[in-house]
A protein has these predicted regions:
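Conserved structural motif at the start of ABC-family nucleotide-binding domains
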Residues: 35-37, 49-52
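Conserved hydrophobic segment flanking the Walker A/P-loop of ABC-type ATPase nucleotide-binding domains
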Residues: 44, 53, 57-59
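ABC ATPase NBD Q-loop/coupling interface
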Residues: 92-108, 172
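The feature captures the beta-strand-to-loop junction immediately N-terminal to the Walker
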Residues: 66-68
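Walker B catalytic motif
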Residues: 197-201, 208
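Q-loop/switch helix immediately C-terminal to the Walker
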Residues: 115, 119, 125-140, 152
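Conserved beta-strand-loop-alpha-helix hinge in the C-terminal portion
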Residues: 246, 250, 254-276
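ABC ATPase C-loop
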Residues: 188-189
Length: 276
């Protein structure tokens, strides 16, 4: 049975303790959630899109957000990072206890909010290595050596099944859909965010590429067990790899239900009719 609590009741219980990779409990009871969205209303040029979204992601939790086309999923992702196309008209977004609703996009990113784009932009003339070095320096607030970047890139590219030549290619220039998504996961690994928002990362991937991405996310979480993940998707297939703690259903700009993986299975079998 799914919950009608958009904050994800199972998730709040999970913050009292979650085992790390050595079996020790992470003490999460005294800390604020990593990501807290309260009564979020968002508009664009065409009018209101989100109409009161409530959602909480705690440390070490994986949340999935599913919904039909036009529900507002990608709008939520854009609003979380402060995309100028969207205006927050009511409500708030908090990152690790700090209200970031009015913060600029780059400030949110430096604070630890990461978005894996549905359609990453190509940047001609800037190599993947150059981009990641600049991004890591911005995130850490200090210079990062080329050697440090290359060592980390080599390790993670092997984990993600990426060819070594990838490092010198121009960012997303001529990349296949799968290469773009692998690059997004590579960025997530090196930038070490507090919260990673995956905006339809499974879009355009075949089953093998999907498995690599899913396992790549799992590998990042194994290295950093406190990482919070919000995966936005149309399909249950990504969730077989990510295994979410909570699945939320977004319809007409509102979270209308939250529950466990059984919610995704229900959507896969019968669609969104139960919540329309």
């Amino acid at each position: 049975m799914s919950r009608r609590d958009g904050s994800g009741g199972r998730a709040s219980a999970g913050r009292t303790g979650k085992p790390d990779q050595k079996g020790k409990l992470l003490d999460m009871s005294a800390t604020p959630p990593l990501l807290e969205i309260k009564d979020l209303h968002v508009s664009a040029e065409d009018g209101a899109i989100l109409r009161g979204v409530d959602l909480i992601v705690g440390a070490g939790e994986v949340h999935a957000l599913m919904g039909p086309n036009g529900a507002g999923k990608s709008t939520l992702a854009g609003a979380l990072l402060g995309h100028p196309a969207y205006t927050v008209t009511q409500g708030s977004i908090s990152l690790n206890g700090e209200d970031v609703t009015a913060w600029a996009t780059d400030v949110r990113a430096k604070a630890g909010l990461f978005l894996a784009f549905q359609y990453p932009e190509a940047i001609e003339g800037v190599s993947v290595t150059q981009f990641l070095r600049q991004a890591m320096a911005a995130r850490k607030g200090t210079e990062v050596s080329v050697l440090e970047v290359r060592v980390l890139m080599t390790e993670w590219m092997e984990r993600l099944g990426m060819d070594s030549s990838f490092a010198s290619r121009h960012l997303n220039q001529g990349f296949s859909g799968g290469e773009k998504k692998r690059n997004e996961i590579l960025q997530m690994a090196l930038l070490e965010p507090l919260v990673a928002v995956l905006d339809e990362t499974d879009s355009g991937l075949d089953i093998d590429a999907l498995r690599v991405v899913g396992r790549g996310v799992a590998a990042v979480r194994a290295e950093r067990p406190a990482l919070g993940v919000l995966a936005i998707t149309h399909y249950e297939r990504l969730l077989t790899e990510l295994v979410p703690d909570v699945v939320h259903v977004l319809v007409s700009g509102r979270v209308v239900a939250s529950g466990g993986p059984e919610v995704a299975a229900q959507i896969e079998s019968s669609g969104y009719e139960a919540w329309r």
